[in-house]
Amino acid sequence: MEELIEENNIKIGVLALQGGFKEHVEMVKSIKHCFSECENKYKYSIIVQEVKSVSDIKKLNPHGIILPGGESTSMAIIASSNNDGENIFTFLKEYIKQGNFIWGTCAGSIMLSNNVDGQKVGGQSLIGGLDVLISRNYFGRQIDSFETKINLNLKFSKNNNNSILLENFEAIFIRAPAILDVIDKENVEIIGEYIVTKKDGTKEKVITAVKQNNIIASVFHPELTNDNRFHQYFVQLVLNNHLIKIKI
């Protein structure tokens, strides 16, 4: 069998500093292939690897990167003490500016946000780029973690009807943040919401997932389920972006 050439591979890096990176790797592996959406469809194999340093990222040269859940402050500390001399977060800021896709889940969504409510004293290093207000540990402590079904309206391009509705998607919230507000309402698209019933019986709608250009954020953990549809969505976005760059 003829070996796949570079153009027939889509490479996904999963930041493996701390948290649930192995689950993300396994979920991406379960997808196996994706296809271009042009008239003559091309089949793309998916390569996924853990990345722990800037040198790892440069070596893999991924088309997209996933930031896992975990403890955002711990990840920021590990990133700042990276032993190859380059801060991963600084590198990822430039990676995003170059138009590459990135997806943060739970703690990863905090790291991608420009504004964090409830940030620890002295703050923490953030990657930023996502123009929202996010609240750390909005859903409470570990014992307040829960699972529920939500609907997601997954957008592929801005001002375009091309979207996929995922109904009854299993969402796992573990000491989860919540997106309280969208600052840049023109460019940030809401793809998931949830109605929270507070202890006093009142209800509040919070945002659970958003897309801003090449940045995706979800406050829940798709990687802890048996449903790889959100990962399929991200991989397809990465592929579409890659095809635009190489103009297939």
Swiss-Prot record:
Gene3D superfamilies: 3.40.50.880
Positions contributing to L-glutamine binding: 70-72, 136, 174-175
Catalytic activity: aldehydo-D-ribose 5-phosphate + D-glyceraldehyde 3-phosphate + L-glutamine = pyridoxal 5'-phosphate + L-glutamate + phosphate + 3 H2O + H(+); L-glutamine + H2O = L-glutamate + NH4(+)
Active site location: 106, 221, 223
MF terms in GO: glutaminase activity; pyridoxal 5'-phosphate synthase (glutamine hydrolysing) activity
Coiled-coil stretches: none
GO cellular component: cytosol; glutaminase complex; phagocytic vesicle
CDD domains reported in the protein's UniProt record: GATase1_PB (cd01749)
Keyword hit for Lyase: yes
Superkingdom: Eukaryota
InterPro entries (alphabetical): Class_I_gatase-like (IPR029062), PdxT/SNO (IPR002161), PdxT/SNO_CS (IPR021196)
Keywords: Glutamine amidotransferase, Hydrolase, Lyase, Pyridoxal phosphate
Involved pathway(s): Cofactor biosynthesis; pyridoxal 5'-phosphate biosynthesis
Sequence intervals crossing the membrane: none
Family, per entry: Belongs to the glutaminase PdxT/SNO family.
Function, as annotated: Catalyzes the hydrolysis of glutamine to glutamate and ammonia as part of the biosynthesis of pyridoxal 5'-phosphate. The resulting ammonia molecule is channeled to the active site of pdx1.
Protein name according to UniProt: Probable pyridoxal 5'-phosphate synthase subunit pdx2
Native source organism of the sequence: Dictyostelium discoideum (Social amoeba)
